[in-house]
């Protein structure tokens, strides 16, 4: 198993476009994990809670996604940590959840690849960046009861801010019909 996981990591590392750029490397790790993996959480099967489940088998629960991200970030030399708490879907339901904290450019951010990996109604994958480099304030609407030694207050490396693809304001009256 270890050799197979090592081969998967090495093959991915060969595809990195700019290994010296932390943000670009983090983005490519994010995309690789969500493109490679689909969410699967059967009770009692620990393989789905591992980086092997996510990167080799292509199926994992949140713990497997997070451990795969951690493994690839570690190998890229990017400081990061696993974090556990509770996530809620906005409808009052949720449960125990794991995601990552990552240090990009000297600031810490929340990174949740599991929540960025939705499946569309037709079964296709949609690539999203809603949970890519969030501050504590930004993530607190859906993630809570987490404790860690890092303060995530910057938004400079958030995907939408960094790429300039965000709304500063919105008005229904300005919608084009």
Residue map of PLM features:
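Secondary-structure boundary elements
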Residues: 2-54
């Amino acid at each position: 198993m270890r050799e197979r996981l090592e081969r998967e990591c090495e093959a991915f590392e060969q595809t990195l476009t700019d290994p010296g750029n932390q943000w670009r490397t983090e983005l490519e790790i994010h995309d690789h994990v969500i493109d490679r993996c689909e969410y699967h959480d059967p009770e009692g099967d620990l393989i789905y809670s591992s980086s092997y489940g996510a990167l080799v088998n292509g199926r994992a629960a949140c713990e497997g996604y997070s451990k795969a991200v951690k493994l690839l970030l570690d190998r890229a030399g990017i400081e990061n940590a696993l974090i556990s708490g509770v996530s809620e879907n906005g409808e009052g339901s949720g449960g125990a959840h794991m995601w990552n904290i990552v240090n990009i450019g000297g600031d810490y951010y929340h990174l949740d690849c599991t929540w960025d990996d939705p499946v569309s109604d037709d079964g296709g994958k949609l690539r999203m960046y809603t949970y890519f480099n969030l501050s504590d304030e930004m993530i607190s609407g859906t993630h809570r009861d987490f404790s860690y030694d890092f303060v995530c207050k910057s938004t400079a490396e958030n995907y939408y801010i960094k790429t300039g693809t965000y709304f500063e304001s919105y008005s229904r009256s300005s919608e084009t019909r």
